[in-house]
Design a protein with these regions (language model features):
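Generic hydrophobic/aromatic pocket-lining and core-packing "Φ" positions
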Residues: 36-39
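Anionic group-transfer/hydrolysis microenvironments
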Residues: 27, 55, 161
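Flavin (FAD/FMN)-binding glycine-rich loop and adjacent Rossmann-like elements that form
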Residues: 2-7, 17, 61, 122-123, ...
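Second-shell loop/turn segments in exported
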Residues: 27, 75-76, 92-98, 153, ...
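Conserved N-terminal/central alpha/beta ligand/cofactor-binding core
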Residues: 1-7, 15-16, 21-23, 41, ...
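Glycine-rich Rossmann-fold phosphate-binding loop(s) that bind the pyrophosphate
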Residues: 29-33
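A compositional/structural signature marking long, glycine- and acidic/polar-rich segments
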Residues: 128, 140-141
Protein backbone atom coordinates (compact mmCIF):
# COMPACT_ATOMS: atom_id res chain seq x y z
CA UNK A 1 0.00 0.00 0.00
CA UNK A 2 2.81 2.43 0.82
CA UNK A 3 4.48 1.71 -2.53
CA UNK A 4 1.20 2.26 -4.36
CA UNK A 5 0.64 5.49 -2.44
CA UNK A 6 4.10 6.75 -3.40
CA UNK A 7 3.52 5.81 -7.05
CA UNK A 8 0.18 7.60 -7.12
CA UNK A 9 1.62 10.76 -5.59
CA UNK A 10 4.45 10.84 -8.12
CA UNK A 11 2.15 10.12 -11.09
CA UNK A 12 -0.26 12.89 -10.09
CA UNK A 13 2.44 15.36 -9.16
CA UNK A 14 1.35 15.62 -5.53
CA UNK A 15 3.82 16.63 -2.80
CA UNK A 16 5.02 14.07 -0.27
CA UNK A 17 3.44 16.09 2.52
CA UNK A 18 -0.08 17.48 2.36
CA UNK A 19 -0.03 21.30 2.22
CA UNK A 20 -1.49 23.22 5.13
CA UNK A 21 -5.07 24.34 4.49
CA UNK A 22 -4.89 26.69 7.42
CA UNK A 23 -4.77 26.97 11.17
CA UNK A 24 -8.09 27.05 12.94
CA UNK A 25 -9.52 27.26 16.43
CA UNK A 26 -11.74 24.26 15.70
CA UNK A 27 -11.86 21.68 12.92
CA UNK A 28 -15.19 19.88 12.52
CA UNK A 29 -15.13 16.72 10.42
CA UNK A 30 -18.51 15.74 9.00
CA UNK A 31 -21.18 18.21 7.87
CA UNK A 32 -24.31 16.36 8.81
CA UNK A 33 -26.74 17.97 11.22
CA UNK A 34 -24.35 17.55 14.17
CA UNK A 35 -21.34 18.93 12.30
CA UNK A 36 -23.21 21.90 10.88
CA UNK A 37 -24.53 22.76 14.33
CA UNK A 38 -21.15 22.36 16.02
CA UNK A 39 -19.38 24.51 13.44
CA UNK A 40 -21.83 27.40 13.58
CA UNK A 41 -22.18 27.28 17.37
CA UNK A 42 -18.41 27.68 17.69
CA UNK A 43 -18.22 30.31 14.96
CA UNK A 44 -20.79 32.49 16.68
CA UNK A 45 -18.67 32.34 19.82
CA UNK A 46 -15.78 33.81 17.85
CA UNK A 47 -13.91 30.68 16.76
CA UNK A 48 -12.31 30.31 13.34
CA UNK A 49 -13.76 27.00 12.09
CA UNK A 50 -12.99 24.58 9.27
CA UNK A 51 -15.88 22.28 8.37
CA UNK A 52 -14.87 19.24 6.31
CA UNK A 53 -17.37 17.04 4.47
CA UNK A 54 -16.78 14.07 2.18
CA UNK A 55 -19.84 14.65 -0.01
CA UNK A 56 -20.78 17.47 -2.45
CA UNK A 57 -23.80 18.33 -0.31
CA UNK A 58 -24.23 18.84 3.41
CA UNK A 59 -26.88 17.68 5.82
CA UNK A 60 -25.91 14.01 6.11
CA UNK A 61 -28.97 11.79 6.29
CA UNK A 62 -31.14 14.88 5.79
CA UNK A 63 -29.53 15.70 2.44
CA UNK A 64 -31.05 15.00 -0.96
CA UNK A 65 -28.69 12.05 -1.34
CA UNK A 66 -30.28 10.06 1.49
CA UNK A 67 -33.55 11.91 2.27
CA UNK A 68 -34.34 11.18 5.92
CA UNK A 69 -36.59 13.76 7.56
CA UNK A 70 -35.22 16.15 10.16
CA UNK A 71 -37.14 15.84 13.39
CA UNK A 72 -36.92 15.67 17.15
CA UNK A 73 -38.12 17.25 20.35
CA UNK A 74 -36.84 20.81 20.62
CA UNK A 75 -37.44 23.87 22.79
CA UNK A 76 -38.93 21.85 25.63
CA UNK A 77 -38.76 22.16 29.40
CA UNK A 78 -35.67 23.92 30.69
CA UNK A 79 -33.93 23.55 27.29
CA UNK A 80 -35.77 26.34 25.51
CA UNK A 81 -32.92 27.03 23.09
CA UNK A 82 -32.29 23.40 22.15
CA UNK A 83 -33.00 23.05 18.45
CA UNK A 84 -32.81 26.75 17.63
CA UNK A 85 -29.96 26.33 15.17
CA UNK A 86 -31.68 23.48 13.40
CA UNK A 87 -34.76 25.63 12.89
CA UNK A 88 -32.59 28.13 11.01
CA UNK A 89 -31.42 25.70 8.32
CA UNK A 90 -33.94 22.86 8.48
CA UNK A 91 -36.20 22.25 5.48
CA UNK A 92 -39.80 23.38 5.63
CA UNK A 93 -41.17 20.03 4.53
CA UNK A 94 -40.74 16.73 6.33
CA UNK A 95 -41.00 13.09 5.38
CA UNK A 96 -38.67 10.35 4.22
CA UNK A 97 -37.94 9.46 0.59
CA UNK A 98 -39.47 12.61 -0.88
CA UNK A 99 -38.39 14.67 -3.93
CA UNK A 100 -34.89 16.15 -3.69
CA UNK A 101 -36.04 19.75 -3.38
CA UNK A 102 -37.83 18.94 -0.12
CA UNK A 103 -34.47 18.63 1.66
CA UNK A 104 -33.27 22.10 0.60
CA UNK A 105 -29.56 21.41 0.13
CA UNK A 106 -28.95 24.93 -1.15
CA UNK A 107 -30.66 26.48 1.87
CA UNK A 108 -28.19 24.66 4.11
CA UNK A 109 -25.22 25.79 2.01
CA UNK A 110 -26.44 29.39 1.98
CA UNK A 111 -26.89 29.29 5.75
CA UNK A 112 -23.28 28.24 6.22
CA UNK A 113 -22.03 30.76 3.67
CA UNK A 114 -23.42 33.56 5.83
CA UNK A 115 -21.14 32.54 8.71
CA UNK A 116 -17.91 34.48 8.14
CA UNK A 117 -15.98 32.39 10.67
CA UNK A 118 -16.74 29.05 8.95
CA UNK A 119 -14.80 27.75 5.94
CA UNK A 120 -16.46 24.78 4.26
CA UNK A 121 -14.40 22.12 2.50
CA UNK A 122 -16.68 19.94 0.38
CA UNK A 123 -15.68 16.54 -1.05
CA UNK A 124 -12.80 16.08 1.41
CA UNK A 125 -12.57 12.85 3.37
CA UNK A 126 -10.42 12.61 6.51
CA UNK A 127 -7.73 9.95 6.06
CA UNK A 128 -5.26 10.56 8.88
CA UNK A 129 -4.38 12.43 12.04
CA UNK A 130 -1.19 13.53 13.73
CA UNK A 131 -0.83 13.65 17.49
CA UNK A 132 1.40 15.13 20.14
CA UNK A 133 1.15 12.53 22.87
CA UNK A 134 -2.55 11.86 23.30
CA UNK A 135 -3.62 15.15 21.73
CA UNK A 136 -4.65 15.47 18.07
CA UNK A 137 -2.78 18.32 16.40
CA UNK A 138 -3.88 17.97 12.78
CA UNK A 139 -6.20 16.12 10.43
CA UNK A 140 -5.32 15.27 6.84
CA UNK A 141 -8.16 15.05 4.31
CA UNK A 142 -8.18 13.87 0.69
CA UNK A 143 -10.44 15.17 -2.08
CA UNK A 144 -12.66 12.31 -3.22
CA UNK A 145 -12.37 13.26 -6.92
CA UNK A 146 -8.94 14.81 -7.48
CA UNK A 147 -7.05 12.94 -4.76
CA UNK A 148 -5.44 16.17 -3.55
CA UNK A 149 -4.74 16.33 0.17
CA UNK A 150 -4.80 19.15 2.71
CA UNK A 151 -3.79 19.32 6.35
CA UNK A 152 -5.84 21.13 8.97
CA UNK A 153 -4.29 22.26 12.25
CA UNK A 154 -6.21 23.27 15.37
CA UNK A 155 -6.17 22.89 19.15
CA UNK A 156 -9.66 21.35 19.04
CA UNK A 157 -11.36 18.81 16.77
CA UNK A 158 -14.97 17.66 16.64
CA UNK A 159 -15.64 14.19 15.25
CA UNK A 160 -19.03 14.42 13.55
CA UNK A 161 -18.27 11.79 10.91
CA UNK A 162 -20.92 9.35 12.12
CA UNK A 163 -18.35 6.55 11.97
CA UNK A 164 -16.15 7.94 14.73
CA UNK A 165 -13.43 8.21 12.09
CA UNK A 166 -11.24 10.81 13.78
CA UNK A 167 -11.33 9.06 17.13
CA UNK A 168 -10.58 5.74 15.44
CA UNK A 169 -7.63 7.18 13.50
CA UNK A 170 -6.33 8.68 16.74
CA UNK A 171 -6.45 5.29 18.46
CA UNK A 172 -9.42 5.95 20.73
CA UNK A 173 -11.23 2.99 22.26
CA UNK A 174 -14.52 2.18 20.58
CA UNK A 175 -17.26 -0.39 20.48
CA UNK A 176 -19.38 -1.70 17.66
CA UNK A 177 -22.31 -4.06 18.06
CA UNK A 178 -24.24 -5.22 21.12
CA UNK A 179 -22.90 -5.66 24.66
CA UNK A 180 -23.77 -8.75 26.67
CA UNK A 181 -26.71 -8.61 29.05
CA UNK A 182 -24.36 -9.04 32.01
CA UNK A 183 -22.53 -5.77 31.32
CA UNK A 184 -25.37 -3.29 31.82
CA UNK A 185 -28.27 -5.49 32.89
CA UNK A 186 -30.40 -4.66 29.85
CA UNK A 187 -33.28 -7.10 29.68
CA UNK A 188 -33.31 -7.55 25.91
CA UNK A 189 -29.53 -7.60 25.40
CA UNK A 190 -28.00 -10.86 24.10
CA UNK A 191 -26.40 -13.28 26.53
CA UNK A 192 -23.12 -12.90 24.67
CA UNK A 193 -21.80 -9.75 23.04
CA UNK A 194 -21.93 -9.74 19.25
CA UNK A 195 -21.31 -7.48 16.26
CA UNK A 196 -24.93 -6.95 15.28
CA UNK A 197 -25.90 -3.32 14.62
CA UNK A 198 -28.85 -1.46 13.22
CA UNK A 199 -28.70 -1.53 9.43
CA UNK A 200 -28.58 0.99 6.62
CA UNK A 201 -31.60 2.06 4.59
CA UNK A 202 -31.82 2.34 0.81
CA UNK A 203 -34.92 4.45 0.30
CA UNK A 204 -36.85 4.85 -2.95
CA UNK A 205 -40.12 5.95 -4.50
CA UNK A 206 -42.10 5.46 -7.69
CA UNK A 207 -44.06 8.00 -9.73
CA UNK A 208 -47.14 7.79 -11.95
CA UNK A 209 -45.94 7.80 -15.54
CA UNK A 210 -49.39 8.49 -16.97
CA UNK A 211 -49.08 5.50 -19.26
CA UNK A 212 -47.89 1.92 -19.14
CA UNK A 213 -44.16 1.58 -18.54
CA UNK A 214 -41.80 -1.37 -18.60
CA UNK A 215 -39.03 -2.52 -16.29
CA UNK A 216 -36.29 -5.06 -17.09
CA UNK A 217 -37.46 -8.59 -16.34
CA UNK A 218 -34.69 -10.97 -15.41
CA UNK A 219 -33.30 -12.69 -12.32
CA UNK A 220 -31.71 -10.09 -10.08
CA UNK A 221 -30.59 -12.76 -7.63
CA UNK A 222 -33.28 -12.17 -5.00
CA UNK A 223 -36.41 -14.19 -5.63
CA UNK A 224 -39.82 -12.74 -4.80
CA UNK A 225 -43.30 -14.20 -4.94
CA UNK A 226 -46.80 -13.06 -4.04
CA UNK A 227 -46.25 -13.89 -0.37
CA UNK A 228 -42.87 -12.31 0.33
CA UNK A 229 -42.88 -9.31 -2.00
CA UNK A 230 -43.48 -5.80 -0.70
CA UNK A 231 -46.62 -4.43 -2.38
CA UNK A 232 -45.75 -0.78 -1.94
CA UNK A 233 -45.20 2.33 -4.06
CA UNK A 234 -42.22 3.58 -2.06
CA UNK A 235 -39.70 2.42 0.51
CA UNK A 236 -38.63 4.39 3.57
CA UNK A 237 -36.20 3.65 6.40
CA UNK A 238 -37.67 0.18 6.89
CA UNK A 239 -35.88 -0.88 3.70
CA UNK A 240 -32.94 -1.60 5.92
CA UNK A 241 -30.19 -4.18 5.55
CA UNK A 242 -26.68 -5.07 6.71
CA UNK A 243 -27.40 -5.69 10.39
CA UNK A 244 -24.95 -8.60 10.53
CA UNK A 245 -22.26 -6.99 8.39
CA UNK A 246 -19.65 -4.36 9.23
CA UNK A 247 -21.25 -0.95 8.69
CA UNK A 248 -17.87 0.50 7.71
CA UNK A 249 -15.83 -2.15 5.92
CA UNK A 250 -18.85 -3.69 4.18
CA UNK A 251 -20.82 -0.51 3.58
CA UNK A 252 -20.72 -0.55 -0.22
CA UNK A 253 -21.75 -4.20 -0.20
CA UNK A 254 -24.63 -3.32 2.13
CA UNK A 255 -25.73 -0.48 -0.15
CA UNK A 256 -25.48 -2.67 -3.25
CA UNK A 257 -27.59 -5.40 -1.68
CA UNK A 258 -30.19 -2.83 -0.63
CA UNK A 259 -30.42 -1.60 -4.21
CA UNK A 260 -30.62 -5.19 -5.44
CA UNK A 261 -33.65 -5.82 -3.24
CA UNK A 262 -35.35 -2.64 -4.46
CA UNK A 263 -34.88 -3.56 -8.12
CA UNK A 264 -35.78 -7.22 -7.58
CA UNK A 265 -38.99 -6.37 -5.76
CA UNK A 266 -39.98 -3.73 -8.31
CA UNK A 267 -39.32 -6.13 -11.17
CA UNK A 268 -41.63 -8.68 -9.57
CA UNK A 269 -44.38 -6.10 -9.08
CA UNK A 270 -44.11 -4.90 -12.67
CA UNK A 271 -43.59 -8.19 -14.47
CA UNK A 272 -44.62 -11.22 -12.43
CA UNK A 273 -47.42 -10.31 -10.06
CA UNK A 274 -50.81 -11.10 -11.62
CA UNK A 275 -52.85 -8.35 -9.96
CA UNK A 276 -50.53 -5.43 -10.64
CA UNK A 277 -52.86 -2.80 -12.06
CA UNK A 278 -51.62 -0.08 -9.69
CA UNK A 279 -48.03 -0.61 -10.84
CA UNK A 280 -48.50 -0.69 -14.61
CA UNK A 281 -48.32 3.07 -15.09
CA UNK A 282 -45.64 3.66 -12.51
CA UNK A 283 -41.88 3.87 -12.81
CA UNK A 284 -39.09 4.29 -10.29
CA UNK A 285 -38.66 7.98 -9.62
CA UNK A 286 -35.65 7.74 -7.33
CA UNK A 287 -33.50 5.10 -5.64
CA UNK A 288 -30.88 6.21 -3.11
CA UNK A 289 -27.30 5.59 -4.20
CA UNK A 290 -26.03 6.50 -0.72
CA UNK A 291 -27.53 4.37 2.05
CA UNK A 292 -28.72 5.98 5.25
CA UNK A 293 -26.59 4.56 8.04
CA UNK A 294 -28.25 4.03 11.41
CA UNK A 295 -25.38 2.79 13.58
CA UNK A 296 -21.59 2.58 13.52
CA UNK A 297 -18.68 2.92 15.96
CA UNK A 298 -19.30 4.23 19.47
CA UNK A 299 -16.21 6.05 20.70
CA UNK A 300 -15.32 5.35 24.32
CA UNK A 301 -12.55 7.92 24.68
Amino acid sequence: MKQLEAFRRKALGFPDEAPLAGQYDLVVVGAGIAGMSAAVSAARLGCKVALINDRPVIGGNNSSEIRVHLGGRIEEGVYKELGGLQKEFGPEKGGNAQPAENYEDQKKLDWLANEKNVTLFLNYRAIGVTKDGNKITSVTARHIESGKEQKFEAPLFSDCTGDGTIGYLAGADFRMGREAKSEFGESIAPEKADKMTMGASVQWYSVDNGRSSSFPDFSYGVEFNDKNCEKVLMGEWTWETGMNLDQIKDFERIRDYGMLVVYSNWSYLKNQMKENTQYRNRKLGWVAYVAGKRESRRLMG
